[in-house]
């Protein structure tokens, strides 16, 4: 065993995934390649505190859709870690559990540019920043300068853990997909066919 070998890296992609679409998958695959991640674990949120008061599809259905979406990529996995947790799901708790499961690995949390900018509002933000690297999937029009200046001012020690990278611009959103289903419009080619068939079979988003 080479004791000087760098630690292996695991990508973490958390989200409501209501539903998961090609935008999520492209960002995960690009990050896996760009940051030499051993694998990417998709973790659907259980009871997300930021969605209080909003209608969210059941954890079981969201988990099943993610499972179907990632089954053809040997570098992708899905975890029910947050779904099984009672109460609200906080990123800090998830990262602590993952560190126990993968003590020899570095964690890389993959998120969109908008969520990347909101990290300072997360519960126990200092612990969150110390537990994982963060990868922000940038998009056209996103200006990271304000975020980076805030990071330099308040948490300069964590600046090396924050990474931005460009991903192909895909104008796809879960909100739009739900609206299209409700309006009877096609969603083919916006998300994996296995997910589309699951939505059709279960009648999700029709009302």
From Swiss-Prot:
It catalyses: nicotinate beta-D-ribonucleotide + ATP + H(+) = deamido-NAD(+) + diphosphate. GO terms for biological process: NAD biosynthetic process. It is an enzyme of class 2 (transferase). Its EC number is 2.7.7.18. Catalyzes the reversible adenylation of nicotinate mononucleotide (NaMN) to nicotinic acid adenine dinucleotide (NaAD). Belongs to the NadD family. This is Probable nicotinate-nucleotide adenylyltransferase.
């Amino acid at each position: 065993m080479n004791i000087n070998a760098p630690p292996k890296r695991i990508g973490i992609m958390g989200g409501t995934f209501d539903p998961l679409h090609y935008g999520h998958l492209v960002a995960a695959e690009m990050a896996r390649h760009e940051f030499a991640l051993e694998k990417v674990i998709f973790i659907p949120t259980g009871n997300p505190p930021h969605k209080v008061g909003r209608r969210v599809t059941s954890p079981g259905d969201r988990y099943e859709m993610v499972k179907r979406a990632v089954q053809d990529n040997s570098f992708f996995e899905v975890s029910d870690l947050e779904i099984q947790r009672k109460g609200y799901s906080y990123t800090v708790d998830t990262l602590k559990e993952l560190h126990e499961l993968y003590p020899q690995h570095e964690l890389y949390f993959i998120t969109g540019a908008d969520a990347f900018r909101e990290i300072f509002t997360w519960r126990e933000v200092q612990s969150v920043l110390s537990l994982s690297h963060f990868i922000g999937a940038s998009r056209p029009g996103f200006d990271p300068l304000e975020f980076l200046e805030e990071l330099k001012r308040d948490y300069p020690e964590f600046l090396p853990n924050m990474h931005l990278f460009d991903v192909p611009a895909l104008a796809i959103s879960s909100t739009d997909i739900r609206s299209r289903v409700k309006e009877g419009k096609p969603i083919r080619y916006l998300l994996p066919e296995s997910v589309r068939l699951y939505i059709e079979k279960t009648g999700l988003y029709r009302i």
